[in-house]
Curated annotation (Swiss-Prot):
One of its GO terms (molecular function) is quercetin 3-O-glucosyltransferase activity. PANTHER family: GLUCOSYL/GLUCURONOSYL TRANSFERASES, UDP-GLYCOSYLTRANSFERASE 74E1-RELATED. GO terms for biological process: anthocyanin-containing compound biosynthetic process. It is an enzyme of class 2 (transferase). Its EC number is 2.4.1.115. This is Anthocyanidin 3-O-glucosyltransferase. It comes from Solanum melongena (Eggplant). Belongs to the UDP-glycosyltransferase family. It catalyses: an anthocyanidin + UDP-alpha-D-glucose + H(+) = an anthocyanidin 3-O-beta-D-glucoside + UDP. Gene3D superfamilies: Glycogen Phosphorylase B.
Length: 433
C-alpha cells in the first residue's frame, strides 16, 4: 500500500448543518494539494445524498456511506433518538476507514473529523498512523465554553467568569448541553467527552476569523489548552444548485434598497405556532416588505387571510436561496435563529440581524451579535411577540441606533473579506498536515 500519494479522510457529523461545512473545507483546501490527492468523505447515506446534491460533481472526492444505526425495516428516527443511534454505530467508522485504504491502495495522510465526533475517534489517527485534525464548525467563544464544562457546572450563580473571557457571562447564555444536569444524554455526553479529549488533536480548526474575537484572551486560552488552533473562516457555504422556483430574487429586484426583512430559522428549528402568529401580526401591522422562509407545516399557523392581505408587500416560500437573498441590495435586516452559519452569512453580506435563538450555541451567538459585535438585536423577552418585533423593526428602519448597527456590520463585512483574502496562507498550512 502506497504512502506517496495523499489520501485525506473527512468524517462528518450528519445532523443539522454540520456535514456541509466539512465538505466546504474539502473544497477550500483542495486547490493547495496535488491534483492526484484522494479525499474520502465519510457520512451517513441520507446526509451524503442531501449535501452532494447541492454541489457540482466532485471527481476527487470518494463518498463512503456509514451506518446511521437504524436497523433495516425500522422507522427512521428523528432528533435525539437519531443522534443516539448514530453515536452507537460510530465504532464501525474505524472499519470503514480501513476498507477505504484497502479500496484505494493508499494510506491516509491525515484525518479530519467534525469536533463533535472527536471523543469517539480520538484513537483513530494514531491507529491509522496519520495526524488528526478536529473541525469546530462554530466560533471560538462557544468552543471555549465547552472546554470549561466542569467549571461551569460547578457554578451556582446566575453569572460566571470563564477563563479567556474578560467579561462575565450569564448562565442563560451558556449552551444547555454544558449546563445539563444529566451528562448521560447523547448530546451533552458527546460534547463533554469531546471537550475532555480535544487537546489530543494535532490541530483544531474553526470556521471563524480573528476579527470576531474582540476578546484576545479567548484565542490565547484556546492556544494554551489545545495543540494548534487555526481560524479558517468565514467559510460561507456553497450556494445551492436548486432553482429559485419561488422567484425570490425577481421579487427582490422590485423592492427599494435595504427595505426588505428576510426571515429564516434554519432547517432544524420549528417555530411555535404562537410565535408564527406574532410575527405575522407584526409584519402586517408594519407593512414592511418581507420574504419569509416558512415550511408548509408552519404556514397552517398563519392568521386566517394573512397571505391574501400581505401579497402586495410580502412573500412566503417553503425554501429560499439564502445566500442570494442576503447578497441582494434590497435586504435590510435578517431575522434569524443565530445558527453559526447564518451569522457568518449575515456578516459576509453586511446584513444586520434580529436574533431569536433556540438551542445549542445560539444564545451565546445571539449575545455576541448584540453585546460584543453590536451588529444586531436580541428579540425582547427571548420569544417573538407582536410588540417586540415591531420595536426591533422600528430600531432598524426608523432610529439612529439601527444606522449604527448597520455601519458596524458593514465594517465586519470588510474584515471578513480581508480574512478570506488572507486565508490562502492558513489553508496552505492546514493542507500540509
Amino acid at each position: 500500500m502506497t504512502t506517496s500519494q495523499l489520501h485525506i479522510a473527512f468524517l462528518a457529523f450528519p445532523f443539522g448543518t454540520h456535514a456541509t461545512p466539512l465538505l466546504t473545507l474539502v473544497q477550500k483546501i483542495s486547490p493547495f494539494l496535488p491534483s492526484s490527492t484522494i479525499f474520502s468523505f465519510f457520512n451517513t447515506s441520507s446526509s451524503n445524498s442531501s449535501i452532494f446534491s447541492k454541489v457540482p460533481n466532485q471527481e476527487n472526492i470518494k463518498i463512503y456511506n456509514v451506518w446511521d444505526g437504524v436497523k433495516e425495516g425500522n422507522d427512521t428516527p428523528f432528533g435525539l433518538e437519531a443522534i443516539k443511534l448514530f453515536i452507537q454505530s460510530t465504532l464501525l467508522i474505524s472499519k470503514i476507514t480501513e476498507e477505504a485504504e484497502e479500496e484505494t491502495g493508499v494510506k491516509f495522510s491525515c484525518i479530519f473529523s467534525d469536533a463533535f465526533l472527536w471523543c469517539f475517534l480520538v484513537k483513530l489517527p494514531k491507529k491509522m498512523n496519520a495526524p488528526g485534525v478536529a473541525y469546530w464548525t462554530g466560533g471560538s467563544c462557544s468552543l471555549a465554553v465547552h472546554l470549561y464544562t466542569d467549571l461551569i457546572r460547578s457554578n451556582k450563580e446566575t453569572s460566571l467568569k470563564i477563563p479567556g473571557f474578560s467579561s462575565t457571562l450569564s448562565i442563560n447564555d451558556i449552551p444547555p448541553e454544558v449546563t445539563a444536569e444529566d451528562l448521560e444524554g447523547p448530546m451533552s455526553s458527546m460534547l463533554y467527552n469531546m471537550a475532555l479529549n480535544l487537546h489530543k488533536a494535532d490541530a483544531v480548526v474553526l470556521n471563524s476569523f480573528q476579527e470576531l474575537d474582540r476578546d484576545p484572551l479567548i484565542n490565547k486560552d484556546l492556544q494554551k489548552n489545545l495543540q494548534k488552533v487555526f481560524n479558517i473562516g468565514p467559510l460561507v457555504l456553497q450556494s445551492s444548485r436548486k432553482l429559485d422556483e419561488s422567484g425570490c430574487i425577481q421579487w427582490l429586484d422590485k423592492q427599494k434598497e435595504k427595505s426588505v426583512v428576510y426571515l429564516s430559522f434554519g432547517t432544524v428549528t420549528t417555530l411555535p405556532p404562537n410565535e408564527i402568529g406574532s410575527i405575522a401580526e407584526a409584519l402586517e401591522t408594519k407593512k414592511t416588505p418581507f420574504i419569509w422562509s416558512l415550511r408548509n407545516n408552519g404556514v397552517k399557523n398563519l392568521p386566517k387571510g394573512f397571505l391574501e392581505r400581505t401579497k402586495e408587500f410580502g412573500k412566503i416560500v417553503s425554501w429560499a436561496p439564502q445566500l442570494e437573498i442576503l447578497a441582494h441590495k434590497s435586504v435590510g435586516v435578517f431575522v434569524t435563529h443565530c445558527g453559526w452559519n447564518s451569522i457568518l452569512e449575515g456578516i459576509s453580506f453586511g446584513v444586520p440581524m434580529i436574533c431569536r435563538p433556540f438551542f445549542g450555541d445560539q444564545k451565546l451567538n445571539s449575545r455576541m451579535v448584540e453585546s460584543v459585535w453590536e451588529i444586531g438585536l436580541q428579540i425582547e423577552g427571548g420569544i417573538f411577540t407582536k410588540s417586540g418585533i415591531i420595536s426591533a423593526l422600528d430600531t432598524f428602519f426608523n432610529e439612529e441606533k439601527g444606522k449604527i448597527l448597520r455601519e458596524n456590520v458593514e465594517g465586519l463585512k470588510e474584515k471578513a473579506l480581508e480574512a478570506v483574502n488572507q486565508m490562502m496562507e492558513v489553508q496552505q498550512k492546514i493542507s500540509r498536515f
